């Protein structure tokens, strides 16, 4: 997955720097991107971006500054109360009305922003629950060592909270990866969109229905099961409290 993302990113920089002639990778418009690779790109990028944003929102919600706390609470509660499909329609249609005339904002970038916002709100609540589960003595230990707030969070609190929240974060990541199939409703042909659209519309695939969706289900199961197994391995590696 990471190799594919790296190839896609580096290929864009290379083609933009030296042109499209005699290059192995050429720039692809977002409307032309599709298939299972689109699901992998959206899932990997959005989970990677939503984790630090979710940590910031969780800390902001517990902040003593009223403005920061209010902004984080409103953002989390609003995003959690809106279906993801609504945010995707906003990314596809509504955002264009707020951009200056003649401005082109790539569709896949708009979708990444909306999905990241959606998943970060859920990750923030998972991390907030982990922070609340920590004993009060951990905070007092940080104070007794003379650590300020950033040092206490970076060295003592967040490492323990993130270890506790691994199952919840993985649950959000798996759900987010499966929700990337919703981009088909805004005319982005991911794996499911390709099956429901051009593949089933082709006469060459007449009578073939369950096999296509069965293959798609197997692909998604392999990725989600791999994520689950990795999280269990990570939990065992980080279970230092019983050693």
Predicted regions and their residues:
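Transmembrane alpha-helices and adjacent helix-loop boundaries
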Residues: 1-243
């Amino acid at each position: 997955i990471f190799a594919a993302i790296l190839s896609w990113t580096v290929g864009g920089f290379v083609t933009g720097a030296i042109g499209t002639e005699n290059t192995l990778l050429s720039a692809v418009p977002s409307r032309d991107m599709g298939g299972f690779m689109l699901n992998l790109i959206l899932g990997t990028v959005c989970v990677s971006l939503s984790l630090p944003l979710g940590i910031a929102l969780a800390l902001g919600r517990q902040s003593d500054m009223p403005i920061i706390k209010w902004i984080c609470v409103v953002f989390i509660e609003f995003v959690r109360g809106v279906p993801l499909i609504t945010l995707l329609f906003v990314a596809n249609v509504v955002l264009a009305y707020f951009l200056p005339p003649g401005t082109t904002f790539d569709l896949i970038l708009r979708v990444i922003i909306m999905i990241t916002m959606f998943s970060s709100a859920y990750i923030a609540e998972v991390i907030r629950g982990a922070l609340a589960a920590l004993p009060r003595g951990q905070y007092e230990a940080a104070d007794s060592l003379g650590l300020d707030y950033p040092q206490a969070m970076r060295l003592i609190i967040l490492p323990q909270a993130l270890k506790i929240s691994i199952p919840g974060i993985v649950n959000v990541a798996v759900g987010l990866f499966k929700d990337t199939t919703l981009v088909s409703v805004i005319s982005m042909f991911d794996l499911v969109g390709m099956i429901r659209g051009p593949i089933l519309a082709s006469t060459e695939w007449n009578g073939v229905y369950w096999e296509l969706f069965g293959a798609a289900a197997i692909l998604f199961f392999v990725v989600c099961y791999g994520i689950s197994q990795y999280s269990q391995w990570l939990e065992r590696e980080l279970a230092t409290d019983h050693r």
